[in-house]
Amino acid sequence: MAQHAVYFPDAFLTQMREAMPSTLSFDEFISACQRPLRRSIRINTLKISVADFLALIAPYGWSLTPIPWCHEGFWIERDDEEALPLGSTAEHLSGLFYIQEASSMLPVAALFADDNHPQRVMDMAAAPGSKTTQIAARMGNRGAILANEFSASRVKVLHANISRCGIANTALTHFDGRVFGAALPEMFDAILLDAPCSGEGVVRKDPDALKNWSPESNLDIAATQRELLDSAFHALRPGGTLVYSTCTLNRQENEEVCLWLKETYADAVEFLPLDDLFPDADRALTPEGFLHVFPQIYDCEGFFVARLRKISSLPAMPAPGYKVGTFPFTPLKGREALHVTQAANAVGLLWDENLHLWQREKEVWLFPAEIESLIGKVRFSRLGIKLAESHNKGYRWQHEATIALACPTHAHAFELSAQEAEEWYRGRDIYPQTPPAADDVLVTFQRQPLGLAKRIGSRIKNSYPRELVRDGKLFTGNS
């Protein structure tokens, strides 16, 4: 594999020599940093099992190597990447997998390491959504996830990835993470803080990642990380689990941030060792039980992961100074709720008691029940999924609801051929040889929902959202 030129500041190299355990080779570290990163994917088990996915893609000639810390994660090699980018494959468009760096699968693996079943989880720095979608899959789309993102421009990307993966149990917020300890004290069973960092571990993906690096900036970033971790720890309920992670390599942003929390709340913090997270984890283990992953150890990005438990309650932080404002939704109950549910079920949209119906003017939404106790405490950018818009003749069902809720074996399901599915993704109407009998059609491909559509004569009218329409080659094996 070809090497690429990585920019290394002298002070960074000095710092790494001091930080690296004697069991690791510094020369191997430099060599690993200059190798391009191996591509990796995570199968979305909300949509398909690992076994079924492997059977589905077997004819494609993709080479998949299991990632040891994530059962549904694989390093991938493909011969047709130039002709068909991985993100343009039908399987990616329908949410069957997420393109995710192998190291970044570690934090969620750690969060669920003891096979715990948290009902309310926060992902404090969530965009672009790889870890939020991984958490949702581990939760089976049940309970609730508060996915927060400080960057306004990245919230839209976060929502797009959540929607593509068929996730229904998520609320999105747009805050500085430092507000949550005060705003939502001891409200979460589990929290992931994948903290903003200096990014020293990502040079294999971005050779210029260290262009603006300095020891002073590391210290400034670590100060922010301590404040974020303090906030996250206050938002965690006693007995809850918190995972702190970064994609950087220095001790100041990693071990020392966690040790600061332990020193500050000595009677409340318990470090949970990660030595048995996966076979060979001990190669990256620190004396504290954290994982400090240098890139040469597992041939991946550099990463740091710490797992801890809150063993006692903490005094509350000062109340936040902001006003949440009036919540514009009202619960939908009784006859109205029954009418919506029956109409949705008739076209193949199904949900359980984990989701509750709410209404805003003509909009009908489904909110995760576990998030309802947070209403009035924070302002949401988006909550749950938009199910429908009501109109004189019934309901206009929304695309994100179809992707998350549709039953592909429903009586109105209509399976497209590969050629027809490609036309669908291009935004074109479908003219099947044998049109469906029903007027309302649940369009599927590979037994996955692509959308709800209307049959007009012998034509299926395309309803794929314009902003998602693709062109060019989309399907492996098609000419």
Swiss-Prot record:
The active site is at C247. It is an enzyme of class 2 (transferase). InterPro entries: Methyltr_RsmF_N, MeTrfase_RsmB-F_NOP2_cat, MeTrfase_RsmB-F_NOP2_dom, Nol1_Nop2_Fmu_2, Nop2p, RCMT, rRNA_ssu_MeTfrase_F, RsmB/NOL1/NOP2-like_CS. S-adenosyl-L-methionine binds at A125, A126, A127, P128, G129, S130, K131, E149, D176, D194. Its main location: cytoplasm. GO terms for cellular component: cytoplasm. GO terms for molecular function: RNA binding; rRNA (cytosine-C5-)-methyltransferase activity. Pfam families: Methyltr_RsmB-F (PF01189), Methyltr_RsmF_N (PF17125), Methyltranf_PUA (PF13636), YebU_pre-PUA_dom (PF21150). PANTHER family: 28S RRNA (CYTOSINE(4447)-C(5))-METHYLTRANSFERASE-RELATED, NOP2 YEAST -RELATED NOL1/NOP2/FMU SUN DOMAIN-CONTAINING. Belongs to the class I-like SAM-binding methyltransferase superfamily. RsmB/NOP family. This is Ribosomal RNA small subunit methyltransferase F. The lineage of its organism: Bacteria, Pseudomonadati, Pseudomonadota, Gammaproteobacteria, Enterobacterales.
